[in-house]
């Protein structure tokens, strides 16, 4: 809980820096990149996927008991283009099967391919109950990337900086090179916008359907976990800045971009503060859009959060 409180304190401090509630709301759209059209399309796609899941035949994994899956494909018109949505829906008999087998089951990656206009994702459920907030968060996160790419008319991965980041992240997860790439990745503007768009989708769904305390949605969100990871990995990098393998990576980055270690860390630290600020303002926007009071500092947090069956999603 301490880590969450520290982050929430940072969020609160940047949220109230001389700004009234109305001041914050006025500049939210341009600063956060929260696009109402992306939110609308995300909700529609969630509903279409939920309908499609109901119609797909149940399949079973070989040698993995207590789990079934459905593979589906839908098409959808978004931002003037037809996109394809491929999904894998995995249902576990109960949490014990999820805990035991989830890491070993083949899953659809969560991504958007700009060249083929294809969104891919995995949807997980336990006893038929979908983790609705991860579902909403994932779709809006990836659709925000698509929206960003339609504005520049090419894939984000085409940029030189992004290529370097992805090359670093292709190394073993515990390596310093991976961690360097990861903190650079999390603090790019396009990723920060996508992360906070995902949080916005989860919050709005909650406020309209479940009214779970904001603390709990944030605590379970990918953006919160990204911010935690960013802070841990940055600290490890700073404590190992003389490491030989890390310096080989830094030399290669400097040769390709002319940017040194101090520049990268400065950029990361600015991005870290910006991400905390974006989270705070996304919460304000979601609560304003749903006409609810600010519950961010409610102390009576619950330890579990709502999951929905496919039927409940279809009726939402």
Residue ranges with predicted function:
Residues 2-13, 17, 26, 30, ...:
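Proteolytic processing junctions in secreted/extracellular precursors
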Residues 180-195:
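Active-site metal-coordination segments of metallo-dependent hydrolases
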Residues 67, 72-74, 78, 84:
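Extended, charge-biased low-complexity segments
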Residues 133, 149-183:
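Post-HEXXH active-site segment of zinc metalloproteases
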Residues 82-136, 146-150:
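Active-site scaffold of zinc-dependent metalloenzymes
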Residues 141, 145:
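Histidine-centered divalent metal-coordination motifs
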Residues 20, 33, 196-316:
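Pan-zinc metallopeptidase signature
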């Amino acid at each position: 809980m301490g880590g969450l409180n520290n982050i929430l304190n940072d969020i609160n401090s940047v949220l109230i820096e001389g700004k009234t509630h109305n001041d914050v709301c006025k500049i939210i759209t341009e600063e956060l990149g929260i696009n109402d059209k992306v939110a609308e399309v995300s909700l529609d796609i969630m509903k279409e996927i939920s309908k499609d899941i109901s119609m797909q035949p149940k399949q079973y994994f070989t040698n993995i008991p207590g789990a079934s899956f459905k593979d589906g494909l839908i098409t959808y018109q978004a931002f003037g283009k037809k996109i394809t949505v491929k999904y894998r829906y995995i249902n576990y008999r109960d949490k014990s099967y999820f805990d035991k087998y989830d890491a070993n089951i083949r899953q659809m990656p969560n991504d958007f391919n700009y060249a083929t206009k294809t969104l891919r994702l995995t949807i997980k459920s336990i006893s038929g109950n979908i983790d609705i907030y991860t579902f909403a968060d994932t779709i809006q996160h990836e659709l925000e990337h698509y929206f960003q790419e339609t504005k520049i008319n090419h894939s984000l991965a085409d940029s030189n900086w992004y290529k370097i980041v992805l090359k670093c992240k292709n190394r073993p997860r515990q390596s310093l090179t991976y961690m360097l790439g990861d903190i650079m990745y999390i603090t790019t503007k396009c990723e920060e916008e996508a992360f906070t768009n995902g949080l916005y989708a989860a919050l709005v769904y909650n406020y309209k359907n479940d009214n779970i305390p904001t603390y709990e949605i944030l605590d379970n969100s990918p953006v919160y976990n990204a911010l935690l990871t960013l802070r841990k990995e940055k600290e490890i990098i700073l404590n190992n800045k003389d490491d030989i393998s890390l310096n080989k990576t830094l030399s290669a980055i400097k040769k390709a971009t002319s940017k040194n270690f101090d520049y990268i860390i400065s950029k990361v630290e600015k991005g870290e503060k910006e991400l905390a600020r974006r989270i705070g303002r996304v919460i304000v926007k979601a609560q304003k859009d749903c006409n609810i009071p600010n519950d961010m500092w409610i102390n009576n947090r619950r330890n579990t959060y709502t999951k929905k069956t496919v039927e409940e999603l279809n009726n939402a």
